[in-house]
Amino acid sequence: MAVKPSANLGKAFQLPHPFNSCVYIQIPPQPTWSINEYWERNPNKQYLDESDTTYLEELTLTPIEKHQALEKLNTIISAADRLQEVDTKNVDPMYTCVDEREMYMNSGQDGETVNKEEILGNAHKIFQDYFTAPTSEKMRSSSDLNAKE
């Protein structure tokens, strides 16, 4: 079934074959909302500051331009905050976001299990019973991070 263009939206265009006979995509001529307008309407949103970007820089071992990173991350956070506006009270949770095919749950039958010591035996370094990955020099020098013997 073809979707006809709406008068209040921009021009519609057809997708290339084989979709051109049944699908239209409508693109508004102008953005329908702005992050800045959303921020003004939602004063209780969370922001990141420079100390957060310093911490992220240490975790990733990658130098970042703090001002630019703050702008981008705060924009992403505020965009994600829009999800709070969606009313999901009467919506059943999904087991998967893939709805093109059925996804079956595990039957609950126990299979072969491996104990924690056997799993951690493969770790190069262990921190509080977890595998660790290389991180910043500040974290590597921490007395809590002990190399496996």
Swiss-Prot record:
GO biological process, one term: mitochondrial translation
The keyword Mitochondrion is annotated on this UniProt entry: yes
Main location: mitochondrion
InterPro entries (UniProt xref): Asp/Glu-ADT_sf_sub_c, GatC
Enzyme Commission code(s) on record: 6.3.5.-
Alphabetized UniProt keyword annotations: ATP-binding, Ligase, Mitochondrion, Nucleotide-binding, Protein biosynthesis
Record-level Gene Ontology MF annotations: ATP binding; glutaminyl-tRNA synthase (glutamine-hydrolyzing) activity
Domain of life, source organism: Eukaryota
Pfam families in the record: GatC (PF02686)
GO cellular component: glutamyl-tRNA(Gln) amidotransferase complex; mitochondrion
Subcellular location(s) per record: Mitochondrion
Catalyses which reaction(s): L-glutamyl-tRNA(Gln) + L-glutamine + ATP + H2O = L-glutaminyl-tRNA(Gln) + L-glutamate + ADP + phosphate + H(+)
Keyword rRNA-binding: no
Assigned protein family: Belongs to the GatC family.
Self-association state and partner proteins as the record states: Subunit of the heterotrimeric GatCAB amidotransferase (AdT) complex, composed of A, B and C subunits.
Entry-linked PANTHER family: GLUTAMYL-TRNA(GLN) AMIDOTRANSFERASE SUBUNIT C, MITOCHONDRIAL
Further details from the record: This protein may be expected to contain an N-terminal transit peptide but none has been predicted.
Function: Allows the formation of correctly charged Gln-tRNA(Gln) through the transamidation of misacylated Glu-tRNA(Gln) in the mitochondria. The reaction takes place in the presence of glutamine and ATP through an activated gamma-phospho-Glu-tRNA(Gln).
Protein name: Glutamyl-tRNA(Gln) amidotransferase subunit C, mitochondrial
Species, as recorded: Trichoplax adhaerens
